[in-house]
Amino acid sequence: MDSTNSISLAEAVKIAEARFKAAVQGCKDDWHNGNDLVILQDNIPQLFGGILIEHFKHCVGEVSGFPVELTVMDSGNSNYHTLVQMPKNNMRLSQVASSPKSAKTSPSEQASINLRAVAAGLKKAPRPMNCWIIFRDAMHKHLRAEFPHLTIQEISTQCSQIWHNLSPEAKRPWQDAAQSAKEEHLRQHPNYKYTPRKPGEKKKRQSRKSKRAAATTTAPEVLQFQLSPNLIPTVPEVTDQPPLTANPVAATGDSPCPEDVLNYFDPNIFPEIYPQAPMAADFFYNAESIRHGLLDAEFDIDFNMDTTFALFDDEMLAFRDGADGDATLPSSFQDTY
C-alpha cells in the first residue's frame, strides 16, 4: 500500500471529529442568528453514520430544546447538501423587539423613524415569499460562502438545478417555511390583496425606471458647473463728462419731429449706460434652490423636477419633431380645450 495515499486511523478519526464539531457549531451559530433552516455541505447522514448522526441531532437539539430534522438534498453530479430544520428562535425575536436602542432615540432620530414608518405605511406591501424564493435565498447564501468565485448568475443557475433535482420529501421543509411566511404576512398585512400588473404597465414601469436613471445620472453633471466671470454684468466706466442733453425741438411745419421725441432721451430708458451694482453670481442658484425647497415642502418630501419631467412619455407632447400642421393634442387633453 502506498503510504502517500493512505492515512492512519487516528488521523481519519481526527478529521471526522473536526468536521463533526464544525457542522454542529455551524448549526448553533445560525440558530442564534435567527435562522431555522441551515444548509450543510455533504451528505451528513452518510458521512457520520447511524450512531454519530443521532449524536449530531442530540447536540444540535440541545441548543433549541427541540428535536431537529435532517433532509438530504441531491444537487446533481454527485454533489449533496444536508438541510437541518430547527425550531424558530423565539428568544432572538423577543430580544430584537425589546432592544434598548429604541428607547434612547433623540428627537431627530425619532422624527426620522416616524417618517420612515409613514413611508412604509404608504408603500404597497410586498408579496409573501414562496418556497422557491425562500430556498433560493438560503441556498444563495450558502453557495456564496462555499464558492466565492461564482458569479450571481452562476449561483442562480445552480440553485435552479438543485431545486429541480430535489425530491418531494426534500421540498417539504421549504413548502412548510413558505406556509409559515404566508401566515406571518397575513398577520402583518390583514388587508393585503394581490393585484397583478396590467400587460402594458410593466413596459411603462421599465421605461420610467430608465428615464429616472438617466435623470439621476445627468443631474449631478448639470449641477456641478462653475459660473464664468463673464456671467456677471459688466459695468461701464464712469466718466466725469455730463450726460448728453437734448435740444428742445418744437413740432412745426418745417420740423416734422414731434414733441414726444424728447421722451426718448429719458435716462431711465437706457439703464445700461449708467452705473449699476454688480449682481452676485450665485443669486440664480440660491433662488432656484429656494424655489425647489418650497415645492418639496408643499407637494412631497421627495419632489424632484428632473424625475417629474422624466415621468412624461413622448406621447404626452403633441408638437414634436416631425409633426405637421394637422397635429392634434393627445386624447387626455382634447376634452379640456
From Swiss-Prot:
Compositionally biased spans, kind Basic residues: 200-212
UniProt protein name: Mating-type protein MAT-2
Keywords noted in UniProt: DNA-binding, Fertilization, Nucleus, Transcription, Transcription regulation
BP terms from Gene Ontology: cell differentiation; single fertilization
Compartments where located: Nucleus
PROSITE patterns: HMG_BOX_2 (PS50118)
GO terms under cellular component: nucleus
SMART domains in alphabetical order: HMG
MF (Gene Ontology): DNA-binding transcription activator activity, RNA polymerase II-specific; RNA polymerase II cis-regulatory region sequence-specific DNA binding
Ranges where the record places region Disordered: 171-219
Main location: nucleus
Cleaved signal peptide residues: none
Ranges annotated as DNA-binding: 125-193
Organism lineage string: Eukaryota, Fungi, Dikarya, Ascomycota, Pezizomycotina
